[in-house]
């Protein structure tokens, strides 16, 4: 891809900004907090933040911009939310109208950006502990699934949780649980382990987003809350305009993955 996965966050963002890199960000910038993204009109921002507060597992807020300001200085010195995400999704009245790599022509002075922690953040800790992460090994995006788990509504925002799935060796499930629990700003501990049917998932080979990965003998499917959840909720709210990241294509911040608070300090 022309950009090494261990490059620092600023170098990766610069490559994204220039158009040189536009792929998924799983496994990139080890040690840094990766973020899901929601951009919406200020008139709906408070209701959306209420929704996130009521559903912290799938929606851990780590950054909020000033109204109309595309910069996110609390997450990094040079982050421009209009250019620094590899791929964006554009929704108008609840309809996905396209995916783009730059939203400067869509930016207006009434938009608010909300960054939410991503489970890609704790994957580096799993790998360091010797726990295999299949989609990183395979070089693909993490599989994501819609579930039957209801969310707590706020204003026009409501829906069901989306989860990521990682096959974990059965003997390592407790270890993976304990490690990810140390990252509440990145969805924290798993929400379920084992039978996907209990979550309303019919077939692990057919993810709703991302790429399918094999669950090998001796492995157990483990499910974490996922930041595509608020993306679906925003779509279903049918706002005149909202912008999100494309699944798997995250904002990479300068905040340490294990920071007690998601505030960048130079």
UniProtKB/Swiss-Prot annotation:
SUPFAM superfamilies associated with the record: PSTPO5379-like
GO molecular function: lyase activity
InterPro entries: D-Glu_cyclase, Putative_hydro-lyase, UPF0317
Enzyme class: lyase
EC number annotated for this UniProt entry: 4.2.1.-
Gene3D superfamilies according to UniProt: PSTPO5379-like (3.40.1640.10), PSTPO5379-like domain (3.30.2040.10)
Nuclease recorded as keyword: no
Alphabetical keyword list: Lyase
Superkingdom, taxonomy of origin: Bacteria
Sequence similarity: Belongs to the D-glutamate cyclase family.
HAMAP family: Hydro_lyase (MF_01830)
Entry protein name: Putative hydro-lyase Jann_2570
Species this protein is from: Jannaschia sp. (strain CCS1)
């Amino acid at each position: 891809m022309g950009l090494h996965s261990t490059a620092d966050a600023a170098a990766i963002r610069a490559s994204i900004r220039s158009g040189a890199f536009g792929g998924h960000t799983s496994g990139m910038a080890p040690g840094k907090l990766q973020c899901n993204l929601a951009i919406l009109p200020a008139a709906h921002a408070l209701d959306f933040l209420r929704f996130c507060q009521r559903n912290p597992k799938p929606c851990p807020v780590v950054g909020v911009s000033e109204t109309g300001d595309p910069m996110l200085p609390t997450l990094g010195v040079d982050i421009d939310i209009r250019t620094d995400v590899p791929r964006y999704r554009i929704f108008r009245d609840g309809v996905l109208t396209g995916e783009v790599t730059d939203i400067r022509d869509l930016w207006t002075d009434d938009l608010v950006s909300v960054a939410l922690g991503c489970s890609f953040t704790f994957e580096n800790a799993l790998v360091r502990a010797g726990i295999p992460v299949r989609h990183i090994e395979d070089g693909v995006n993490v599989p994501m699934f819609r579930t039957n788990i209801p969310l707590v509504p706020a204003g026009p925002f409501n829906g069901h949780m989306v989860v990521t799935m990682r096959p974990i060796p059965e003997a390592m499930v407790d270890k993976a649980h304990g490690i990810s629990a140390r990252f509440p700003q990145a969805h924290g501990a798993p929400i379920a382990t084992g039978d996907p049917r209990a979550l309303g998932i019919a077939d692990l080979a057919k993810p709703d987003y991302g790429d399918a990965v094999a669950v090998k003998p001796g492995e157990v499917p483990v499910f974490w809350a996922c930041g595509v959840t608020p993306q679906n909720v925003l779509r279903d709210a049918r706002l005149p305009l909202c912008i999100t990241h494309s699944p798997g294509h995250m904002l990479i911040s300068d905040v340490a993955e294990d920071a007690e608070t998601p505030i960048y300090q130079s």
